[in-house]
Amino acid sequence: MEEKYHPSPDSPTEIPFHPAHASYLKSLVTQAGARDPSHLIFGADRHKYKLNPPASLEEVRRFEEKHNLLLPEEYKFFLTQIGNGGAGPYYGLYSLEEAERYTEYLETTQTAAKQKDEEVPAPAFIDRRMTPEDWAVRMEELDNCSDDEYDSLMYKLCAGMLVIGTQGCTYDTVLMCRGSERGKIVYIDWNLEPGYGPFFTGMPFLYWYEMYFQEILQDHNLTSYGYLCLKSEEEFVKDFCEMDKKTGEEDNNMDFPPLNKEQLLSSLFRFKTAAAETIDFLAALKEPELDAMRTELLFRFDLHRGREVFEQLLSGSNPDAAICCARRLP
């Protein structure tokens, strides 16, 4: 399948893998470092907005051959033209050498894992066709299997998956190299809970990388980068108002993964301030199941309006939501 670059509106070129774009991304890293000189943004004290020297094409090819993996073109462009790891979301990006430490279940396919004499690429398990039930069943299998069976199941689970960075604790950043999400970023919690599967950001690698630094330059909240959609305030209000008008057929044609109203509303936590129109929208919103979240957002953007809505909820319209909001406030 042909890979396509998804530029931001500020990108200098829409030509994939152009040298000008490599220069542009390096410039974004430098600008972000100047905006955060004390490295206060989460993870910045680790990578310090520094990129490693680029890898050679030969180094990339050796990595691919060793792991029977075809790396996405965007990622190869990054490695060879921008940097072999370094500055990036959360604690930054691993170099190919660092990524080697996390390839235990990548070095062989499910066939090679059993027979040690074949290398047939295994299909990606982490794929948009995977349902929450599929994930839960696989996790239950992992909990109730022998050591040999565990390794075999993990090879299947990790097929086509390359860990390229960490968010801390048990959360890692994964670049998918096979399946529907090839070239896109997925977040995974290695606690491997049956009820909590991988998070599909839906973002191609270069877009995910670029927008992280754009968010820094726009002084947005980076706490949950990649988990929250990167819409503007205007786009958010427009899309939210149109959600009730969409048919099931239209939902099926949406970019993956589709968002529900709660997920869309939560995207506003990226912003430290909001326009008067956004504040008015939140104050007037009539969605009882979203009352706690919209009130928390109002407290963030306009303390007076937040207090007004909070008192309305507490006095009778939705006291449970008011209590929930109070518990979530710092």
Kindly label every feature range from the protein language model.
Residues Y24, L28, D239, S267, ...:
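Charge-rich, solvent-exposed alpha-helical interaction surfaces
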Residues E2-V163, E287-L290, F299-D302, N318-D320, ...:
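A surface-exposed partner-binding patch
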Residues H21, P132-R138, E233, K261-E262, ...:
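Short amphipathic alpha-helical segments that mediate assembly, nucleic-acid/protein binding
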Residues W135-G248:
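Long, contiguous interaction/recruitment modules in multidomain scaffold/adaptor proteins
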Residues M1, A32-D36, A113, I216, ...:
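Short, flexible helical or helix-coil boundary motifs
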Residues K238-T273:
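Alpha-helical segment of the N-proximal tetratricopeptide repeat
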Residues K261-T273, A292-H304, Q312, A322-P330:
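Structural detector for internal amphipathic alpha-helices that build alpha-solenoid repeat scaffolds
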Residues M243-N252, T273-L285, L303-S315:
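Amphipathic alpha-helical scaffolding segments comprising HEAT/armadillo-like alpha-solenoid repeats
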